[in-house]
């Protein structure tokens, strides 16, 4: 017996209801992976901009006298220092940012690989994707493809 959501109850074939939940779980998992990948890419882009800012400031400070006063934001407080004191700290920060960017890049590649494996495992196609390769696969192995239904994600 079907309820208002269109799922089949216990008296009917419960396999169809389980399949719908499974497809929803696959889509949710895929969207979660995509969101994680976007978050990594966003953080990497943000750090790239920060790295460029550090490079500009370092290049500018290298051209001025080491005893010249400069101001640095430390924990929300503007602190007066000399170029001689600030320059090594900025260079250290720049190196740390570069290491973090490299780590994020590796994580981004791993997440992309994980996402592609998930897509292949669950036969996920994105809307607007070229369907010619899928048609070619269907003509070669029609028997194998009919048993696993693909998931279309918008």
From Swiss-Prot:
GO biological process: negative regulation of amyloid fibril formation; positive regulation of cytoskeleton organization; protein folding
Disulfide bond residue pairs: none
SUPFAM superfamilies: Prefoldin
Record keywords: Chaperone, Cytoplasm, Mitochondrion, Nucleus
Disordered, as annotated region: 1-20, 126-154
Extent of Gly residues compositional bias: 9-18
Pfam families: Prefoldin_2
GO cellular component, one term: prefoldin complex
Compartments (UniProt record): Nucleus; Cytoplasm; Mitochondrion
Biased composition (Basic and acidic residues): 126-139
Domain of life: Eukaryota
Family: Belongs to the prefoldin subunit beta family.
Oligomer and partners: Heterohexamer of two PFD-alpha type and four PFD-beta type subunits. Component of the PAQosome complex which is responsible for the biogenesis of several protein complexes and which consists of R2TP complex members RUVBL1, RUVBL2, RPAP3 and PIH1D1, URI complex members PFDN2, PFDN6, PDRG1, UXT and URI1 as well as ASDURF, POLR2E and DNAAF10/WDR92. Interacts with URI1; the interaction is phosphorylation-dependent and occurs in a growth-dependent manner.
Name listed for the protein in its UniProt record: Prefoldin subunit 2
Origin species: Rattus norvegicus
Primary gene name: Pfdn2
């Amino acid at each position: 017996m079907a309820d208002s959501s269109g799922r089949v109850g216990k008296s009917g074939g419960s396999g169809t209801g389980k399949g719908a939940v499974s497809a929803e779980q696959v889509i949710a998992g895929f969207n979660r992976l995509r969101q994680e990948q976007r978050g990594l890419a966003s953080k990497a882009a943000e750090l790239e901009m920060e790295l460029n800012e550090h490079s500009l400031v370092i290049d500018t400070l290298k051209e001025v006298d080491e005893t010249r006063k400069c101001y640095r934001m430390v924990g929300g407080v503007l602190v007066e220092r000399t170029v001689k004191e600030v320059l090594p700290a900025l260079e250290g920060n720049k190196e740390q940012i570069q290491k973090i960017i490299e780590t994020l890049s590796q994580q981004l590649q791993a997440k992309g690989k994980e996402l592609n494996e998930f897509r292949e495992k669950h036969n996920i196609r994105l809307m607007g994707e070229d369907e010619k390769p899928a048609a070619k696969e269907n003509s070669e192995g029609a028997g194998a493809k009919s048993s696993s239904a693909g998931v279309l994600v918008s």
